[in-house]
């Protein structure tokens, strides 16, 4: 991964991928692999980002984090009763890319991606929400 870091703008991973990378790099002994704790999520993403020398976005059940190896930022997930078990990570990644392309700052980007995935997983149908629906959801649920 270090050899590719000059070619990668950002690495987007989920909690299972994060745990696998930490284990593959023998970094799990330095921190807890319990990614149901905000501080552990922040430490994990910062550790991997520092190790690989690239920015990392990490999305988990409890929220999303970003790090460049020095700084780290975390945004909580929205509470949603899941109506399906697959696809939320793909929706999160798609929203994250859109947010990068339109120039949202890190907090806005993670918030938008969390909202988009939450809307998707909270619906019975397998169609992703619209951008407008995600914006409306944030305005109604974010404090």
Model-identified regions with their sequence ranges:
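Short, well-ordered strand-loop elements centered on a beta-strand within folded domains, enriched
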Residues: 69-76, 143
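Conserved phosphate/ATP/ADP-binding segment of small-molecule kinases
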Residues: 1-72
